[in-house]
Amino acid sequence: MAYPFQLGLQDATSPIMEELANFHDHTLMIVFLISSLVLYIISSMLTTKLTHTSTMDAQEVETIWTILPAVILILIALPSLRILYMMDEINNPALTVKTMGHQWYWSYEYTDYEDLCFDSYMVPTNDLKPGDLRLLEVDNRVVLPMELPIRMLISSEDVLHSWAVPSLGLKTDAIPGRLNQATVTSNRPGLFYGQCSEICGSNHSFMPIVLEMVPLKHFENWSASMI
């Protein structure tokens, strides 16, 4: 989860988020180098009186500043397209969970089970226990098995929502009448927090998401107790 005054990204807990963090660093380094070069050129122009007043054209320079930006854009685009493909690819999911957005709570249905569904509301501040996180705790957590590919089917009952869990690299729009999907895979157990990331009304800030990733055996025990 994020902490106050945190400058970096949340710790990656899924392969997708690890790729996104690496791509962020890769792109940021390219932007930094370009910005430094532009700043150097501007500084040189402002601090020197030397000018090429007789130069009418320079084909070599024009060729370089046409090809070089194209190469840089390709270096940015290729990793981005690879990650987009990875995020859309879902092969043989071990579990499917349907998520519906409402004003202002989430409902979940485990489609592989006959009758396993529940609503998830934010815990009011007055009901928080010691150690609970304000505006992030829910009454029913989404319990999922770790180290397995899980398909999330995401939609909405009323207005636009967005189901987002930053540490897993997830952010999928919940659109009425449309079913979007995302892949959830966690490398380690733990609690992972998210929130609705699309303005959806007056209580938009009170739609937290809590995923509890557990070993498969614990998930089987939990699902048996819920049915």
Curated annotation (Swiss-Prot):
GO biological process: ATP synthesis coupled electron transport
Binding site for Mg(2+): 198
Positions with a binding annotation for Cu cation A1: 161, 196, 200, 207
Function of the molecule: Component of the cytochrome c oxidase, the last enzyme in the mitochondrial electron transport chain which drives oxidative phosphorylation. The respiratory chain contains 3 multisubunit complexes succinate dehydrogenase (complex II, CII), ubiquinol-cytochrome c oxidoreductase (cytochrome b-c1 complex, complex III, CIII) and cytochrome c oxidase (complex IV, CIV), that cooperate to transfer electrons derived from NADH and succinate to molecular oxygen, creating an electrochemical gradient over the inner membrane that drives transmembrane transport and the ATP synthase.
Description of how the protein assembles with itself and partners: Component of the cytochrome c oxidase (complex IV, CIV), a multisubunit enzyme composed of 14 subunits. The complex is composed of a catalytic core of 3 subunits MT-CO1, MT-CO2 and MT-CO3, encoded in the mitochondrial DNA, and 11 supernumerary subunits COX4I, COX5A, COX5B, COX6A, COX6B, COX6C, COX7A, COX7B, COX7C, COX8 and NDUFA4, which are encoded in the nuclear genome.
InterPro entries: CcO_II, CcO_II-like_C, CcO_II_C, Copper_CuA, Cupredoxin, Cyt_c_oxidase_su2, Cyt_c_oxidase_su2_TM_dom, Cyt_c_oxidase_su2_TM_sf
Protein name, UniProt field: Cytochrome c oxidase subunit 2
Cofactor(s) needed by this chain: Cu cation
EC number(s) from the headed UniProt entry: 7.1.1.9
Protein family: Belongs to the cytochrome c oxidase subunit 2 family.
Cofactor binding: number and manner: Binds a dinuclear copper A center per subunit.
Organism listed in the record: Malacomys longipes
The UniProt record lists the keyword Ribosomal protein: no
CDD domains attached to this UniProt entry: CcO_II_C (cd13912)
Enzyme class: translocase
Membrane topology per record: Multi-pass membrane protein
